[in-house]
């Protein structure tokens, strides 16, 4: 029954993104682009609010200069898929159930996002997501484009 429900969820899910294993993540392959790197989990309410905004960024900025990479930290794949069944994602998602990448980035809260310039340098870090700050977030992106 559990497998049936998961399969059903995958079929009706609004997910547009590809989901990858964290071991497939290669930030260097995006060199030359500004990267918005976002860590999230299914239980995180602010994470749900950030997804529509991140989707809008992909439509706003040129794909050859900007990309979004998100990393899900749910231990259980089912929790991630359940979340993605409710919230549309137009960007690629990497699943890091052990938190190995999160540990390297020394996360302090959820969600946490990093703005990485086209040379691969982390230039901004945001803990949490606040809709009242989206203009600021976008200015920071535009300064790097």
Predicted regions and their residues:
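Sec-dependent N-terminal signal peptides
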Residues: 4-13
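A short beta-strand-turn-helix
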Residues: 17-35
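Conserved helix-turn-beta segment immediately C-terminal to the redox Cys motif
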Residues: 33, 51-71, 85
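Short pre-active-site segment immediately N-terminal to redox-active cysteine/selenocysteine motifs
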Residues: 33-35, 39-43, 109
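Conserved redox-active cysteine motifs that mediate thiol-disulfide chemistry
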Residues: 39-56
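Thiol-based oxidoreductase modules, predominantly thioredoxin-like and allied folds used
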Residues: 65-78, 90-98
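Short, internal strand/loop/helix patches
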Residues: 84-118
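Thiol-/selenol-based redox modules, centered on thioredoxin-like
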Residues: 118-145
């Amino acid at each position: 029954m559990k497998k049936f429900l998961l399969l059903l969820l995958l079929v009706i899910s609004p997910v547009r993104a590809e989901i990858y294993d964290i071991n497939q993540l290669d930030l260097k392959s995006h060199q030359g682009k500004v990267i918005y790197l976002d860590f999230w989990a299914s239980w995180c309410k602010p994470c749900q609010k950030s997804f529509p905004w991140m989707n809008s960024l992909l439509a706003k900025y040129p794909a050859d200069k900007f990309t979004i990479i998100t990393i899900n930290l749910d231990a259980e794949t089912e929790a991630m898929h359940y979340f993605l069944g409710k919230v549309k994602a137009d960007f690629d998602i990497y699943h890091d159930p052990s938190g190995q990448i999160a540990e390297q980035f020394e996360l302090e809260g959820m969600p946490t996002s990093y703005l990485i310039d086209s040379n691969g340098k982390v230039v901004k870090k945001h803990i949490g997501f606040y809709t009242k700050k989206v203009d600021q977030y976008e200015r920071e992106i535009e300064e790097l484009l």
